[in-house]
């Protein structure tokens, strides 16, 4: 089975469009292309119960971000100030870049 194409990169600002965190904006912390999932800052917070270890002698309940499906996030265009679809464009010097479909702003 083919792996899904992930349309966002680490460091992009995205908005969640579906689910319990719909409407929240955040920065992409990591991308898992094999699973088609992304971890977004401040989105899909889960609680993990951890035992005390030498690295973390306190233990306890830790809150951290869990991955969300990449299909549930859209890249956020700062010029349009809204989530947008992206297109790919090859510039005159031959470099590939991502472009906002609404306003034509170069994202990369």
Swiss-Prot record:
One of its GO terms (cellular component) is ribonucleoprotein complex. Keywords: Ribonucleoprotein, Ribosomal protein, RNA-binding, rRNA-binding. The keyword RNA-binding applies. The keyword Cell cycle does not apply. One of its GO terms (biological process) is translation. InterPro entries: KOW, Rib_uL2_dom2, Ribosomal_uL24, Ribosomal_uL24_CS, Ribosomal_uL24_KOW, Translation_prot_SH3-like_sf. GO terms for molecular function: rRNA binding; structural constituent of ribosome. HAMAP family: Ribosomal_uL24_B (MF_01326_B). One of two assembly initiator proteins, it binds directly to the 5'-end of the 23S rRNA, where it nucleates assembly of the 50S subunit. PANTHER family: MITOCHONDRIAL RIBOSOMAL PROTEIN L24 (PTHR12903). Part of the 50S ribosomal subunit. Belongs to the universal ribosomal protein uL24 family. This is Large ribosomal subunit protein uL24. It comes from Moorella thermoacetica (strain ATCC 39073 / JCM 9320). The lineage of its organism: Bacteria, Bacillati, Bacillota, Clostridia, Moorellales.
